[in-house]
Amino acid sequence: MNPRRKKRLGLILALVLGASATVGLMLYALNQNMDLFYTPTELVNGKPDGTKPEVGQRLRIGGMVVVGSVKRDSQSLEVRFQVEDIGPKVTVIYDGILPDLFREGQGIVAQGVLVDATTVKAHEVLAKHDEEYMPPEVAEAMKKTH
C-alpha cells in the first residue's frame, strides 16, 4: 500500500472513530438528563405501553395535592404530601421551601427520584396555577383602568 494512501486511511478511520465517540457521549448525556413524566396512576400501574419506572429512576410526577395530606417536619424544611389524579395516591417527600402557589387541592409537578413503588423524593416542586391566575401587579393595574 502506498504510504500516502495509508496516511489517508488512518486519518479517515480516526475521524470516523472520533465522530462515533462524540455521538455516543452525546446520547449518553441526553439519556442521563431525561426525566420521564408520570401521573400517579401511571406510576403505580404503569403506562399504557406497559413501561413502569424502576426504583432509583429520575422522573417527574404531576397531579393534584390531596387535601389534608400535607405534613411538615417541625425540625427541618421537609414536607410530605400526597398527589393524586383519578386513581391511586403517591407520596412526595420534599426538603426545601415550597412555591408560593403550593396549596392543597392545587396542581403540582414534582421532579425527583422514585424511592419505592408509591414514594418520590423530590428535589424540585413546581406549583401550577389555574387559567384565571393573574399576577398581583396586573390585577391592580386592571382595577385602576376598569
Swiss-Prot record:
UniProt topology in membrane: Single-pass type II membrane protein
Pfam families assigned: CcmE
Predominant place of localization: membrane
InterPro entries xrefs: CcmE (IPR004329), CcmE-like_sf (IPR036127), NA-bd_OB-fold (IPR012340)
Residues the entry annotates as binding heme: 129, 133
One Gene Ontology term, aspect cellular component: plasma membrane
Keyword hit for Transmembrane: yes
Cysteines paired by S-S bonds: none
Coiled coil, from the record: none
Residue stretches spanning the membrane: 9-29
Superkingdom of the organism of origin: Bacteria
Residue intervals annotated with topology Cytoplasmic: 1-8
GO biological process: cytochrome complex assembly
Homology family: Belongs to the CcmE/CycJ family.
Name this protein carries in UniProt: Cytochrome c-type biogenesis protein CcmE
Organism placement in taxonomy: Bacteria, Pseudomonadati, Pseudomonadota, Gammaproteobacteria, Vibrionales
